[in-house]
Amino acid sequence: MKRMIALDGAQGEGGGQILRAALSLSMITGQPFTITSIRAGRAKPGLLRQHLTAVKAAAEICRATVEGAELGSQRLVFRPGAVRGGEYRFAIGSAGSCTLVLQTVLPALWFADGPSRVEVSGGTDNPSAPPADFIRRVLEPLLAKIGIHQQTTLLRHGFYPAGGGVVATEVSPVASFNTLQLGERGNIVQMRGEVLLAGVPRHVAEREIATLAGSFSLHEQNIHNLPRDQGPGNTVSLEVESENITERFFVVGEKRVSAEVVAAQLVKEVKRYLASPAAVGEYLADQLVLPMALAGAGEFTVAHPSCHLLTNIAVVERFLPVRFGLIETDGVTRVSIE
């Protein structure tokens, strides 16, 4: 019998990232875990619908036995079984992030006995989670370089707080892992601005694009009007394509916040990324830790290691026989497998 790993949910960023990472790693390694003080660092501690959906999805895919899987629970025991490929559908029942649920279960399906398709309904444009276009246009091309083949499709948008969106991913078992080397960003090839609107006047998007264009030379400016019943909602994105990597940044519009202020938040974030020679942005860095650890080698550079990144590394090192090294050099932090 494999030993039970004990995790403190209050460590590091103190949110749902510890739980999601532990679920992924438990499914992959077969190691059971107990986590206490779940989301202790949040205003509403314990499992929310999105986290509970991730737990139930993980349990279904690997036939796990679970204790504490209920709303508000701050303690969970997860004993995994064998991961099974197949077709799965999960509903969050709120505007909780579809992509964070997918992020939890897809790594285990890289080791399944056959191809899989996972469909999740809930929120797709959430201010605290990566949108589907980030997964599709930024993360998945990098995963393909590592040898991981999955394809995400956004079937319907669902903005916060209404939800109602649908995202699906098709994924195949991994034959072998390759090493990812992302030390240099390279020169910028082009930048693309994009605005999504649902039930929001078009002039909002035009003002947001104008704000982006006032700070950057945009090769493309796209405004997409979605059906009104998918809103109300508004998301502004800016994609930076460089020689070695494509990064994508986004901001979700809010009621009573002007278009100019929303877009200015995005401008600030992109300028912060471009001010450093690091290849990888803060949010992408979190998501490269697990696939890099599974490959057993690789490196990337990031401007500053976030609390999420350090938390992810700490959890990975509890489940896998790997050690990460973080070295500050030339104004960046180089993250690698030691």
Swiss-Prot record:
InterPro entries: RNA3'-term_phos_cycl_insert, RNA3'_phos_cyclase_dom, RNA3'_phos_cyclase_dom_sf, RNA3'_term_phos_cyc, RNA3'_term_phos_cyc_type_1, RNA3'_term_phos_cycl-like_CS, RNA3'P_cycl/enolpyr_Trfase_a/b, RPTC_insert. Its EC number is 6.5.1.4. It is an enzyme of class 6 (ligase). It comes from the Bacteria. It is found in: Cytoplasm. GO terms for biological process: RNA processing. It catalyses: a 3'-end 3'-phospho-ribonucleotide-RNA + ATP = a 3'-end 2',3'-cyclophospho-ribonucleotide-RNA + AMP + diphosphate. Keywords: ATP-binding, Cytoplasm, Ligase, Nucleotide-binding. GO terms for molecular function: ATP binding; RNA-3'-phosphate cyclase activity. ATP binds at residues 103, 283-287. The keyword Cytoplasm applies. It holds the Pfam family RTC_insert. One of its GO terms (cellular component) is cytoplasm. The active site is at residue 308. HAMAP family: RTC. NCBIfam families: PRK04204.1-2, PRK04204.1-3, RNA_3prim_cycl. Catalyzes the conversion of 3'-phosphate to a 2',3'-cyclic phosphodiester at the end of RNA. The mechanism of action of the enzyme occurs in 3 steps: (A) adenylation of the enzyme by ATP; (B) transfer of adenylate to an RNA-N3'P to produce RNA-N3'PP5'A; (C) and attack of the adjacent 2'-hydroxyl on the 3'-phosphorus in the diester linkage to produce the cyclic end product. The biological role of this enzyme is unknown but it is likely to function in some aspects of cellular RNA processing. Belongs to the RNA 3'-terminal cyclase family. Type 1 subfamily. PANTHER family: RNA 3' TERMINAL PHOSPHATE CYCLASE (PTHR11096), RNA 3'-TERMINAL PHOSPHATE CYCLASE (PTHR11096:SF0). This is RNA 3'-terminal phosphate cyclase. The gene is rtcA.
